[in-house]
Amino acid sequence: MTNSTAEKQQPLTLDISKEALADINDMLEKTTAQQRVAWALNNLPDTHIVSSSFGAQSAVMLHMLTQVQPDIPVVLTDTGYLFPETYKFIDELVEKLNLNLHVYRADMSSAWQEARFGRLWEQGVEGIEKYNKLNKVEPMQRALRELNAGTWFAGLRRSQSDTRGKLPVLQKVGQQFKLYPIIDWSNKDLHYYLKDNELSYHPLWEQGYVSIGDWHTTQSLQEGMSEQDTRFFGLKRECGLHEFGDGI
């Protein structure tokens, strides 16, 4: 990356052409994750936020972002059904990294949802999609609005699933630019980053959980399974936050 790309620029606007966006992605493909973050902070519009599931290797993105912008808002959409280990992991990372955590939840409590709709996650793809919209998509949309987010950092990686395999580094999604600094990282890359920076995996990693969401729709990795098979009974990979064309 040249010095000019790291200097503070007039932020990009959402009316950028597809051709110009493609050129930027060509440039970003040739840079490191840390250089992508630096470029984004200098070239993409405020407010910058990062979303986190506080999953298996989430400490990587949280550490990388807070090293250069310590007070960056960290958005968690809490369904009320995270593993107990996840809630403890959140507390640990908030303390260790001094995170500026913003927790968003559905307007309707999890108990009320079950009373009204039953266990949506047991009602096939349609039920799962409704559950995700209530508990993840709508709270995240609210976070983006209330935090006036112009740029959204997320830790998606191409190796995680078929649906993520062709993602660019930078996208326009809804009213935000969305940047994936570690899009081309492998599990080995993540391992060494965690080790080099004295960061921990999620506690359930050692029990074979490679993708960690709600306890009722997350399985440990078994022989013959891919990472994407461990979520939502293999029916879906995406929870809705990172699906494209749904306005978020």
Swiss-Prot record:
The active site is at C239 (nucleophile). It is found in: Cytoplasm. The keyword Oxidoreductase applies. The keyword Metal-binding does not apply. Keywords: Cytoplasm, Oxidoreductase. It comes from the Bacteria. One of its GO terms (biological process) is sulfate assimilation, phosphoadenylyl sulfate reduction by phosphoadenylyl-sulfate reductase (thioredoxin). Gene3D superfamilies: HUPs (3.40.50.620). Pathway: Sulfur metabolism; hydrogen sulfide biosynthesis; sulfite from sulfate: step 3/3. It holds the Pfam family PAPS_reduct. One of its GO terms (molecular function) is phosphoadenylyl-sulfate reductase (thioredoxin) activity. Its EC number is 1.8.4.8. GO terms for cellular component: cytoplasm. It is an enzyme of class 1 (oxidoreductase). SUPFAM superfamilies: Adenine nucleotide alpha hydrolases-like. It catalyses: [thioredoxin]-disulfide + sulfite + adenosine 3',5'-bisphosphate + 2 H(+) = [thioredoxin]-dithiol + 3'-phosphoadenylyl sulfate. PANTHER family: PHOSPHOADENOSINE PHOSPHOSULFATE REDUCTASE (PTHR46509:SF1). Belongs to the PAPS reductase family. CysH subfamily. Catalyzes the formation of sulfite from phosphoadenosine 5'-phosphosulfate (PAPS) using thioredoxin as an electron donor. This is Phosphoadenosine 5'-phosphosulfate reductase. It comes from Alteromonas mediterranea (strain DSM 17117 / CIP 110805 / LMG 28347 / Deep ecotype).
